[in-house]
């Protein structure tokens, strides 16, 4: 708050107070004269008052007295004092006029101070505006820096994605190189696949070139953005330093103006105090004695001179203040010009900032377009990855199914082992019972024919039970083999040509229509032992089948699962697409083949144990039939019931052999004794079931 100036009293009030003071002074003089001259009449006093110019006064009696001389002296003194008072009044009026002039000058100075105050307020407002603009610039700088960081992070993420995509492309190229090497080894029938792969390779190479060009463009744009950001930061730092210097100068100037203003106010207050003291001195009544009036007048004259000197000093001070105010006005004008220049600079800077923002917006749009393109490429790569993952999941599911099938096969093997053990026990029991019966028959040759009929019935029942078991086992194995073949076909259709991204489905449809090429041995296998075992499997199986056909005269080679496995192997080999990750499946298949061979060996051992017993039993039965009932021999035209059953079983046997695409041995027609025996036929019917497991 500015200090309130001391307001002078109204001039009419001053004149009234002066007149009152003069009247009071006159009354006091009259009282004093009455006290000093009590014998003087009142009329003389009035006459003396009226005669101002007469130097001599007369009494009522016409004689002079010393009181009259004193009275005359007093009158002269009063006249001189009145003259001096009139002069003083004139001086006072002149001082009043000077005071009015001074007040007018003070009012002008106040007006100038008010204008300076307004200018300072405007400067403060401009300073506040500049501070707000500075804060806005800081916020824009922060946002630009944040956006630049965000773009840098996004560029890093995109660079990482590009690196991952490049690595993926390299892996795909490696896979394609492997596939191309495999395709070079294949026959001319795979020309369509090679053309498709070449197209896909060209597409991948084009995409890679586009990605490399896009990466170079993104790196160049990032470098440009970083350079522009550095230049913008430098420019903002320089502007900040300039604004700080300008603010410091403005604050210094404001401080100096405030100090000068305080000094002016202090001076004005001192002048007002001196004027009030002068007024008080002028207002004091002349209570001095008549001889001291001259001294009072002299003092008043001295004071008037002193006041004139002070007034002159005040005039000089006012002139100096006016000059200072003029200088301040010039400074304010210069500052206004500077502020206008600064405003123009700020406008230019705002225009530059708007241009830079437009450039940044354009760059952002470009980066967004680049991001869109990169996102599209990333989506394509993701789709390819998803397809590969789906294929991997399918392969895993197939592996799980194969594992489940292996478990089922193990369970079936365990069941068959248990059945074999039961059959062995039954055979042992039958052998023991037959031996006991033969001993009894040898001991008692007069046995009835009913026992033989019972034996025949029991044999027929056993044959029927064995047939039912065989049918059930055949149905189960056929279902398992068909299910396994379907799974292997689906697996082969999925595994065909691994590494093909978008063209995989189209190739699957073409592969179903195209004929399958000849099987070839895969070169991707790591170990040579696996390949050698893989090559030796069909030879060993062929040798085993020949030996079984020669020895057993009716054994059928195991089909079903083994044929499905062979077909899967041939398809794998023909396509040349057995990956390195499938060696475990190959080893599992080889183990299954080894187990099948072990089962064959065990069946051969069982047959070797059972055949002599059956031969002995057959010869003994023929001897008993010829001895006891020679008339009951069947006619050559009508076959015996055992032979009919054997013939039916033989038809079934040949049907199974035709379904399994295995020709019977050449010695099967020559040796007919095993076919005549039902127990041998039961064993022959059980042996392929055991071999199929």
Swiss-Prot record:
Name of protein: Golgin subfamily A member 6A
Organism (species): Homo sapiens (Human)
InterPro entries referenced in this protein's UniProt entry, alphabetically: GOLGA_cons_dom (IPR043976), Golgin_A (IPR024858)
GO-annotated cellular components: cis-Golgi network; Golgi cis cisterna; Golgi cisterna membrane
Region (Disordered): 20-69, 497-547, 661-693
Tissue/organ expression: Highly expressed in seminiferous tubes in testis. Highly expressed in spermatids, barely detectable in late pachytene spermatocytes, and not detectable in spermatogonia. Detected at intermediate levels in pancreas and lymph nodes, and at much lower levels in spleen, peripheral blood leukocytes, skeletal muscle, liver, lung, placenta, brain and heart.
Biased composition (Polar residues): 54-69, 676-693
Pfam families for the chain: GOLGA2L5
Entry keyword annotation includes Coiled coil: yes
GO biological process terms, semicolon-separated: Golgi organization
Basic and acidic residues composition bias: residue spans: 537-547
Keyword list, A-Z: Coiled coil
Family from the record: Belongs to the GOLGA6 family.
Highest taxon of the lineage: Eukaryota
Residues forming coiled coils: 14-611
């Amino acid at each position: 708050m500015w200090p309130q100036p001391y307001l002078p009293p109204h001039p009419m009030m001053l004149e009234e107070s002066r007149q009152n003071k003069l009247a009071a002074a006159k009354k006091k003089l009259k009282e004093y004269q009455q006290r000093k001259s009590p014998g003087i009449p009142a009329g003389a006093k009035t006459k003396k008052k009226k005669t101002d110019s007469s130097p001599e006064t007369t009494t009522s009696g016409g004689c002079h007295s010393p009181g009259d001389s004193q009275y005359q002296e007093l009158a002269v003194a009063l006249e001189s004092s009145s003259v001096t008072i009139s002069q003083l009044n004139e001086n006072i009026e002149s001082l009043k006029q000077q005071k009015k002039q001074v007040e007018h000058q003070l009012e002008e100075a106040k007006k100038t101070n008010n204008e300076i105050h307004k200018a300072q307020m405007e400067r403060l407002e401009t300073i506040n505006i500049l501070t707000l603009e500075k804060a806005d610039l800081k916020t824009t700088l922060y946002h630009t820096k944040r956006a630049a960081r965000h773009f840098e992070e996004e560029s890093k993420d995109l660079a990482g994605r590009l690196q991952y995509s490049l690595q993926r492309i390299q892996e795909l190229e490696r896979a394609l190189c492997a596939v191309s090497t495999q395709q070079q080894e294949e026959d001319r029938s795979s020309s369509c696949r090679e053309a498709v792969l070449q197209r896909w390779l060209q597409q991948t190479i084009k995409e890679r070139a586009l990605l490399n060009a896009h990466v170079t463009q993104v790196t160049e744009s990032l470098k440009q953005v970083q350079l522009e950001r550095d230049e913008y930061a430098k420019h903002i730092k320089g502007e900040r330093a300039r604004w700080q210097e300008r603010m410091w100068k403005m604050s210094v100037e404001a401080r100096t103006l405030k100090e000068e203003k305080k000094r002016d106010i202090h001076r004005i207050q001192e002048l007002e105090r001196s004027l009030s003291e002068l007024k008080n001195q002028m207002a004091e009544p002349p209570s001095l004695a008549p001889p001291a009036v001259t001294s009072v007048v002299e003092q008043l004259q001295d004071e008037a001179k002193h006041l004139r000197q002070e007034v002159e000093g005040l005039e000089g001070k006012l002139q100096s203040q006016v000059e200072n105010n003029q200088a301040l006005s010039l400074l304010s004008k210069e500052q206004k010009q500077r502020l206008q220049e600064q405003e123009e600079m700020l406008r230019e800077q705002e225009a530059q900032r708007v241009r830079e923002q437009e450039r940044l917006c354009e760059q952002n749009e470009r980066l967004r377009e680049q991001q869109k393109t990169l996102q599209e490429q990333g989506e394509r790569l993701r789709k390819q990855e998803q397809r590969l993952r789906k294929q991997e999941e399918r392969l895993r599911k197939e592996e799980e199914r194969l594992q489940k099938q292996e478990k089922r096969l193990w369970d079936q093997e365990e069941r068959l082992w248990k059945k074999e053990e039961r059959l062995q026990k039954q055979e042992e029991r039958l052998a023991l019972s037959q031996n006991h019966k033969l001993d009894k028959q040898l001991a008692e040759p007069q046995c009835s024919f009913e026992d033989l009929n019972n034996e025949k019935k029991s044999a027929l029942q056993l044959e029927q039970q064995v047939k039912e078991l065989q049918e059930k086992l055949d149905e189960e194995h056929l279902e398992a083999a068909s299910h396994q073949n379907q799974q292997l076909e689906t697996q082969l259709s999925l595994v065909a040509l691994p590494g093909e991204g978008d063209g995989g489905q189209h190739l699957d449809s073409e592969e179903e229509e195209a004929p399958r090429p000849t099987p070839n041995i895969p070169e991707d296998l790591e170990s040579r032992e696996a390949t050698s075992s893989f090559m030796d499997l069909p030879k060993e199986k062929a040798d085993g089948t020949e030996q079984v056909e020669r020895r057993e005269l009716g054994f059928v080679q195991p089909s079903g699962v083994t044929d499905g496995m062979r077909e899967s192997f041939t398809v794998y080999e023909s396509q040349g697409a057995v990956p390195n990750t499938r060696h475990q499946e190959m080893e599992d298949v080889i183990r299954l083949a080894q187990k099948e061979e072990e089962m064959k060996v065990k069946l051969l051992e069982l047959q070797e144990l059972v055949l002599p017993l059956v031969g002995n039993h057959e010869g003994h039965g023929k001897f008993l039939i010829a001895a006891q009932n020679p008339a009951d021999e069947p006619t050559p035209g009508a076959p015996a019931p055992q032979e009919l059953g054997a013939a039916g079983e033989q038809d079934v046997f040949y049907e199974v052999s035709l379904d399994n695409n295995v020709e019977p041995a050449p010695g099967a027609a020559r040796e007919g004794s095993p076919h005549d025996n039902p127990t041998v036929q039961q064993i022959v019917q059980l042996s392929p079931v055991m071999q199929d497991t």
